[in-house]
């Protein structure tokens, strides 16, 4: 019963995907964060931490800080670090860790599916955090951390996923935390339409 929506992703060039990808800013210890920012001009950490080694500082979570994030994001795009998909697509992401393999589909979801109870939130968010995130989205116009949703096992969805993961991924790289990241692009209209139908018929 859920709507899944294809979209035109803005994503790294294949040749620098491993250098651009990063964990969330807050998960790095200070010395590791500084080393990455100093040694890697491609890391996305420069976008989410645009004031590194800068004297002109702004308040965290302020509009001024988010404007700097937006400016750095636009700079990365102008330098050719990112590319935008030519047509609406869905994506398969597989994360392989020492603890297991996790595979899912990246796509858009409809906000009204949360409002009408089809997508069930796992927690309520503090109003202050909601206001901050709204300001961030209004200012930056992008969101880099997907929301994780689960769904009941479905053989038809699994069949489409299996077909793609047997092909060469668009991205495949392993990070220092022993995790391997792979991404496949679903741009076949037939496969996208079938996935939309399958998700529409899932139990909520």
What are these regions (language model features)?
Residues 1-203:
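A cross-family signal for N-terminal binding/gating loops and helix N-caps
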């Amino acid at each position: 019963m859920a709507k899944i929506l294809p979209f035109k992703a803005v994503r790294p060039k294949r040749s620098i995907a491993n250098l651009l990808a990063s964990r969330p800013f807050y998960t790095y210890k200070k010395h590791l964060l500084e080393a990455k920012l100093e040694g890697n001009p491609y890391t996305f950490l420069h976008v989410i931490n645009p004031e590194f080694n800068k004297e002109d500082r702004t308040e965290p979570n302020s509009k001024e800080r988010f404007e700097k994030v937006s400016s750095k994001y636009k700079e990365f795009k102008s330098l050719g670090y990112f590319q935008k998909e030519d047509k609406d697509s869905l994506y398969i992401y597989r994360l392989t860790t020492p603890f297991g393999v996790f595979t899912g589909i990246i796509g858009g979801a409809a906000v009204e599916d949360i409002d009408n109870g089809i997508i069930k939130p796992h927690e309520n968010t503090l109003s202050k955090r909601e206001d901050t995130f709204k300001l961030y989205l209004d200012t930056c116009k992008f969101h880099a951390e997907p929301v994780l949703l689960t769904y009941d096992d479905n053989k038809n969805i699994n069949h489409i996923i299996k077909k793609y993961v047997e092909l060469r991924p668009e991205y495949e790289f392993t990070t220092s935390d022993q995790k391997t990241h792979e991404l496949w692009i679903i741009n076949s209209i037939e496969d996208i339409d079938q996935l939309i139908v399958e998700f529409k018929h899932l139990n909520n």
